[in-house]
């Protein structure tokens, strides 16, 4: 019996010019994919300076502060304030613009900011403590959501996000942050509401941090770091000096979270530049331990 061999197709041979064109296209696609890839979560460009205004022992003004942040190679500031800073709200915005800084977030709220946000075309996140009302669990969620609704509406009108901030109490528990956020989104169509999570207000959460980060992640607008020891000893600690720092940053790196990362001063007896620099040095130390060369390269 004769087995018939099927006719084999003639190999396609591209002219040299076509082959080069295909190589160019492939190279462009590879470059485009690389360009679209998000920066490593702990990259310098992803960092936000936080708690550097009332806590700064050097008592800098807007221009000095902007110069200091730029000198450290940071590009984003979350602005916290006290009553004495209200007269310089606009000067702060202008100083950041002059130094190429993003006015990333504004603490709580002040009516003077509405006009300034529109006037200067900035769109900061508004960071507000999640309330801790009394009552039963489900009622607390509704009450907290209703308390936040006026600010949520103000943020919506301004084109800003509202970040629910953990600051202790019932409202600072991750499950309750998520519950209030979900209520506002479901009941008031407030999809611009999310969560700002702070490690320095979350020492009790460390044993369950991986689980809690997974719960919060769909709503997370910013994650603020801190050196972490057991029992808040001390509460504020530079990164790299805490017993849990490597483990916590490893969890964050492996979680898939790619949003902003905050580093803090929050020490009224310390120059804010010294505090931020200590956190940057500590962050690099932890990144070396984690082998995160991609993030480390951004600090060269």
Residue map of PLM features:
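Active-site mouth loops of central-metabolism enzymes
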Residues: 48-61, 133-141, 237-238
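Histidine-acidic metal/acid-base catalytic patches
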Residues: 32-48, 63-65, 149-153, 157-159, ...
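N-terminal secretory signal peptides that target proteins for export/translocation
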Residues: 1-10
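Catalytic domains of carbohydrate-active enzymes, especially glycoside hydrolases
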Residues: 62-85, 102-104
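Active-site acidic/histidine proton-transfer and metal-coordination neighborhood
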Residues: 101-195, 199-204, 297
């Amino acid at each position: 019996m004769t087995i018939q061999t099927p006719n084999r197709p003639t190999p396609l041979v591209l002219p040299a010019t076509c082959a080069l064109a295909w190589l160019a296209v492939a190279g462009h696609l590879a470059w485009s994919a690389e360009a679209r890839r998000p920066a490593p979560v702990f990259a310098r460009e992803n960092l936000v300076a936080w708690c550097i205004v009332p806590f700064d022992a050097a008592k800098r003004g807007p221009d000095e502060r902007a110069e200091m942040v730029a000198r450290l190679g940071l590009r984003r500031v979350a602005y916290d304030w006290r009553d004495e800073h209200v007269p310089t709200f606009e000067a702060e915005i202008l100083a950041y613009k002059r130094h190429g800084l993003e006015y990333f977030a504004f603490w709580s709220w002040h009516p003077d900011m509405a006009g300034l946000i529109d006037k200067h075309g900035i769109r900061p996140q508004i960071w507000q403590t999640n309330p801790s009302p009394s009552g039963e669990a489900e009622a607390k969620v509704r009450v907290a959501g209703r308390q936040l609704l006026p600010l949520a509406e103000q943020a919506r009108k301004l084109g800003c996000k509202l970040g629910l901030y953990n600051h202790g109490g019932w409202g600072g528990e991750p499950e309750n942050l998520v519950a209030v956020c979900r209520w506002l989104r479901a009941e008031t169509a407030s999809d611009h509401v999310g969560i700002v999570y702070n490690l320095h207000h979350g020492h009790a959460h460390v044993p369950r941090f991986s689980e809690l980060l997974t719960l919060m992640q769909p709503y997370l607008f910013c994650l603020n770091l801190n050196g972490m020891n057991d029992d808040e000893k001390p509460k504020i600690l530079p990164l790299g000096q805490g017993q849990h720092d490597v483990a916590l940053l490893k969890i964050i790196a492996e979680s898939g979270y790619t949003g902003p990362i905050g580093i803090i001063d929050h020490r009224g007896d310390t120059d804010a530049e010294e505090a931020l620099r200590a956190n940057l040095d500590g962050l690099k130390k932890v990144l070396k331990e984690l082998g995160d060369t991609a993030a480390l390269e951004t600090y060269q």
